[in-house]
Amino acid sequence: MEDKVKLSFDGKDFEFPVLKGSENEKAFDVSELRKKTGLVTLDYGYLNTGSTKSAITFVDGENGILRYRGYAIEDLAEKATFPEVAWLLIYGELPTEAQLMRFRTMLTENALIHENLLHFFREMPPSAHPMGILSSIVNAVGLFTPRFYDDDNKADVFDLTTVGLISKIRTIAAFTYKASIGEPF
């Protein structure tokens, strides 16, 4: 028998399904609440509301728990490299040695940004916040990387786009820092 939560309002009973999360925590699905009852929920600070189902992240702030794909963040920070964690987040498991070597190579091969993006860095106000610069340049990357929009082979495009963007963000962050301290790129 499927678990349900019963809500009584205005003399009527309504049922909502109970779901299990990635850590077997229980929640009830209120996505049909307004449609069924005319009611909405109010959750100050979003403390009791999950925004979506996630197989990637589990957060329990009250108990200090953060996991990515079932791995404690403390373990990943201590034992895994950036490319290993990136692979884990993208593909759902830690990479094999061969996958990791290929991924590292792809990150290196895709680190360069288009030369015309340097104009964006030069035109940013010196007082601009680094996150504002980073997000602006990330948005501009697609203008100079048309292969990110190639629909011929969606799996390859996903891999290239994902690796390309992860790799370029490292370069963009470095350039953003150089710009913030007034040094040339």
Task: Give the ranges of each region predicted by the language model.
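Hydrophobic alpha-helical bundle cores within soluble ligand-binding/oligomerization subdomains
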Residues: 2-185
